[in-house]
Regions:
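A glycine/proline-hinged amphipathic helix-loop "lid/cap" segment
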Residues: 5, 40-182, 452-458
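Intrinsically disordered, polybasic Lys/Arg-rich low-complexity tracts
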Residues: 5-37
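Acidic, Ala/Val/Gly-enriched low-complexity intrinsically disordered segments
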Residues: 16-19, 27, 40, 45-47, ...
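Generic secretory/membrane-interface signal
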Residues: 34, 38, 106, 114, ...
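Alpha/beta-hydrolase superfamily serine-hydrolase fold, recognizing
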Residues: 64, 71-88, 163-458
């Protein structure tokens, strides 16, 4: 996209979504069941399993990007996820049974029907379980983390054409009792030396920060999403298990995010990645951290931060940044928060709870490392892929930041999926959401492979 005009808004048409859904549904019907990864603190669970047909190939389009024909043999669904996915491929039936057949329309936008069905089912399940809210907008963090891990087991198909290795890397300030920051390294089979991906036979790398309001989320909750990103983008993905609030409030997560990014940049040979093509990416709170890292390492960076956030000299700026429905301002004063702050999974009440845990000192709300949208200067930051959802309280944050970057001359690709909600990237049980997630991963892969000097064709 040109850096001189407004960012291009990509709105999904019904016809395009239907076609994408058909492709994904066809692939899902051909998938089979396999065991789900066993949770472990180092991230080594499930490493190297299930090569599947098409493993060891460089991928299509000549740049290691996603070949849709590979999806059919390399997706595996846990049995429960298969059943739930089948159910939500028939949203009209689900909505009729729940007595909620009328479509949800807000400001000219119509909520995706499968998403609406999931939303209605979730409301009823919350009514049965009680939701665990303390009344302060946030439940018990430990309970919430376990719930998110359990949900992740049925939320996404598991890519089996990806090799996964867990390890600990050095941290600026290690959590008590820890030897560093846990990470998982994802590499699609065949991605590397001799794979035909160009870039001197070394793929780009994406440092990924999970979402969860800086309070929940970990390597387990986002394992399937990171597998998908590695498989589709043709990049090596390094997922970061940064410290969480309220045990470790701001700026602990920023410190860990920056330390992990610096480590990846400094270990390109060990990781067998292109040293000049390391990007950052994250969803929700992780998008906030990705934007913060891009700001802190931008060319000529002089970003006021909390005293604990330090940037070692010589850390290069990311090659690109991917921000998926990011939260970029702690003020919570946007129009989309007012309109969509209740009833669409992420609520204003829960957002306030996350903010209270992560940013207990209100003075920190205005810092660029906590609220990148409020940064005085953004020129020189990495080219950005900014993705928002139409029914998301954080939609305006992403669009405003895309506009701000564009005005500063930064290359931006902006996509708004008008019929989606916050968190769709982790809702692979919905065919439409999975198709759009693949599209986002492909877009990030294209950005990381841009100007590839040595493209090859299969």
């Amino acid at each position: 996209m040109s850096s001189t005009g407004p960012p291009a808004k990509v709105v999904r048409s019904t016809k395009a979504v239907t076609a994408a859904k058909a492709r994904t549904t066809k692939a899902t019907r051909r998938s089979t069941t396999s065991a789900t990864p066993t949770p472990d603190p180092t991230g080594e669970a499930g490493a190297g399993r299930g090569h599947g047909r098409g493993a060891g190939r460089g991928g299509g389009r000549g740049r290691g990007l996603y070949n849709r024909q590979m999806q059919r043999s390399n997706e595996r669904w846990p049995l429960a996820a298969s059943l739930v996915s089948w159910l939500f491929r028939h949203p009209e039936l689900v909505l009729a049974l729940l007595g909620k057949q009328a479509p949800i329309q807000v400001n000219g936008r119509v909520l995706n029907r499968s998403t609406q069905a999931l939303l209605e089912v979730s409301k009823r399940l919350e009514g049965v379980t009680g939701g665990g809210d303390t009344g302060e907008g946030l439940g018990d963090p430990l309970v919430m983390r376990k719930q998110l891990q359990r949900m992740a087991l049925i939320a996404m198909p598991i890519r089996t054409d990806v090799h996964v290795v867990g390890r600990l890397i050095p941290a600026t300030e290690s959590p008590e009792g820890s030897n560093g920051i846990p990470v998982r390294i994802y590499r699609r089979f065949g991605t590397g030396v001799g794979s035909g991906v160009g870039l001197g036979a070394r793929p780009p790398a994406i440092v990924y920060y999970h979402g969860g309001g800086w309070v929940t989320g970990d390597l387990i909750s986002h394992d399937a999403s990171c597998r998908l990103l590695a498989a589709v983008s043709g990049c090596v993905v390094v997922a970061v298990d940064y410290r969480l609030a309220p045990e470790d409030p701001f700026p602990a997560a920023v410190d860990d995010a920056l330390a992990a990014y610096a480590w990846v940049c400094g270990h390109a040979d060990e990781l067998r990645i292109a040293e000049d093509r390391v990007g950052v990416m994250g969803d929700s709170a992780g998008g906030n951290l990705a934007a913060a890292v891009a700001l802190l390492t931008r060319k000529g960076a002089s970003v006021p931060t909390a005293s604990a956030v330090t940037v070692a000299p010589g850390i290069p700026a990311p090659f690109a940044q991917g921000l998926l429905y990011p939260g970029l301002s702690a003020r919570f004063d946007s129009e989309s928060i007012r309109i969509f702050g209740e009833g669409f999974f992420l609520t204003l009440q829960s957002m306030k709870g996350f903010r209270r845990a992560y940013l207990p000192d209100q003075a920190d709300w205005e810092l660029a490392a906590a609220s990148p949208l409020l940064a005085d200067e953004v020129d020189g930051v990495a080219p950005a892929l900014v993705v928002t959802a139409g029914f998301d309280p954080l939609c305006d944050d992403g669009q405003a930041y895309a506009d701000k970057l564009t005005s500063a001359g930064v290359e931006v690709e902006y996509r708004c999926y008008d019929d989606q909600v916050h968190g769709f990237f982790n809702m692979g049980i919905l065919a439409d959401s999975l198709a759009l997630s693949i599209e986002v991963c492909d877009a990030m892969g294209r950005m990381m492979h841009r100007d590839d000097p040595t493209p090859t064709e299969e």
